[in-house]
Amino acid sequence: MEQNKPRLFAVILKATLLFVLLNFAFIFTHNLPFGKLSLYNNAFPGRERFPFGETKESYNLSLFDLDAMFASHILAGTTKASDEYRVFLVGDSSVWGTLLTPEQTLAGQLNATSIKACGKTVRAYNLGYPTISLTKDLMILDQTKAYQPDMVIWLTTLEAFPEDKQFESPLVANNAERIRDLIFKYELNASTKDPALNYLSKQDQTLVSQRRAVADLIRLQIYGALWASTGIDQIYPENYERAQTDLEASTDFHGLTTLNAALAIDVLDAGMRAIPVPTILVNEPMLISNGLNSDVRYNFFYPRWAYDAYRHQIAELAAAQNWHYLDLWDLVPADEFTNSAIHLTPNGETLLADKIAEAIRSTCN
């Protein structure tokens, strides 16, 4: 036994040194796109929408690796057919489809109808992500260039515009280097040194510090097998709290008294020119309350003064820039919203899909 003690100590010492070496060697892998290594579109099908969620029962999770998100998406595994007119739908949780199955989403309903554009068959891809920020949308738009879009439809709303919202999305804050590159590339007004951006120090890039990110990549693959066998990617509760229709008598919107110089118009402009294909900007439908204090606020998000000013400003800008623009703010009746003033029922999505289909056909060139 006495002779084994030195050997045991040597083994422990070697293991410790090896771990320390691997831990710090991991720093040199920081720029390697591990997220592109995926079982999706190989061992099992790609997802119809980006991974998002924090409940095991949904076989889903939220992560910050944009490469992994795209690698898990059906888009990454779909070779573009010669007769495919490829349409990307970009936006927030309303596009992603909160409380909707993939078939009930805007993309699902467009694909269920044989829409023809430029002599080809439209195939829509759901690239929505459930946080509200123009900068988040721009980051996703910039990543889509390699996937051969024929058209982009960008659905958004006023809540995505305020300057103080741009880096609030965890997906944005935790992709600081990407955002820095976008700021330089599109000459955005934002600061690359904004404290909301989480740049990784050398210590943050070690294996120990990155263990959660590595675990998330592994979990995403495991959940893929479960998702592929069940089709479940979110929880659909039988009962949920409906969107508010009785509202506070408040005119507050992000502490602003005017929208002048308060909106990230530079980010909107960058997104509209990010991809050299027809891009349709859509002011997405929202709930218009007729309940308590509905003369002051349209809904939980917006006082009337702010939303009216926003609509006027964007309409003028779109006309001046000759953008393709659809203002569908009042398209959907209030009873066709679910748990938010921007989340639609399947019937509400059908109303939206009909308008989007018309726009695709008329904008195709």
Question: What are the residue ranges of the model-derived segments?
Answer:
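Membrane-embedded segments
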Residues: 76-166
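N-terminal Lys/Arg-rich, disordered targeting/topogenic segments
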Residues: 1-7
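Serine-dependent acyl-ester chemistry module
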Residues: 162-310, 333-334
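Residue-level recognition of beta-strand->loop/alpha-helix junctions
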Residues: 126-128, 283, 327-330
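Catalytic His-Asp segment of secreted/periplasmic serine-dependent ester chemistry enzymes
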Residues: 288-365
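Second-shell loop/turn segments in exported
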Residues: 93-100, 126-130, 255-258, 301-304, ...
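Membrane/wall-proximal cationic-aromatic binding patches
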Residues: 31-118, 335-336
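Hydrophobic membrane-insertion alpha-helices, especially the h-region
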Residues: 11-29
